[in-house]
Amino acid sequence: MDIKRIGSQPSGRGPPDWFTGTVRIDPLFKASDPARVAGASVTFEPGARTAWHTHPLGQTLIVTAGCGWAQRQGGTIEEIKPGDVVWFPPGEK
């Protein structure tokens, strides 16, 4: 068993090649073999957004506070709110 205590890992600013605006990334856990899952709490200041990108194994977003928008490239912009879970399949922008 491995317990990661809140605040035990350093926060970082989201890199400008990944994000527009001010974004804070708080790592929660990294994948330990044989697992492939990692998690982070990502906080977006108003107006901040993610650059178009893909994840080879897909990505799950869990909205914990605030509201925002999610969109697949070329798709409809969807409003997301606390409690919503968004799944992006592998390779989808």
Where are these regions (language model features)?
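A short, N-terminal "cap"/entry segment at the start of jelly-roll beta-barrel domains
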Residues: M1-V37
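Short, charged low-complexity linear motifs
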Residues: K4-R5, A38, G74, G83-D84
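Short, flexible coil/turn micro-motifs enriched in small/turn-prone residues
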Residues: Q9, P16, V42, L61-V63, ...
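Intrinsically disordered, low-complexity regions enriched in Ser/Pro/Gly/Gln/His and often acidic
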Residues: S11-G12, E45, I80-K81
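Conserved short histidine dyad/triad with adjacent acidic residue
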Residues: R24-P27, A38-H55
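Generic structural detector for well-ordered beta-strands
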Residues: P27-F29, T43, Q71, E79
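Short, charged/polar surface micro-motifs in flexible loops or helix N-caps
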Residues: D33-A35, F44-G47, C67-W69
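A short beta-strand-loop-beta hairpin characteristic of the jelly-roll/cupin
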Residues: R49, T54-P82, P89-E92
